[in-house]
Amino acid sequence: MEIRTTSHFDKNLAKKIKKNSRLKNKIKNQISILQNNLHHPSLKLHKLKGKRIDEYSFWIEDNLRITCLFVDDVILFTDIITHDEY
């Protein structure tokens, strides 16, 4: 599956990495797993509710998640937030 990102995601990602440079490798690893196996247990992939009902979320570390949409053969990353923020 192809990965695409929103400008909102890109801005938030840059901020998170600037605060914590070790995140870059963790994020790359989880994205690689996502592309190869959506059902891998380390992702903790799940559908969201409420305002983000059309989105999914997967785990990066601790309380950090990436939210995304699945559109045809594209995974669109929409945000990188803590669990409390969604």
PLM segments and residue spans:
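Enriched for short, Lys/Arg-rich terminal
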Residues: 2, 11-16, 21-25, 58-86
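A short, compositionally biased N-terminal segment around positions ~18-40 that is enriched
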Residues: 18-40
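A short, surface-exposed loop/turn module that caps and links secondary-structure elements
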Residues: 33-58
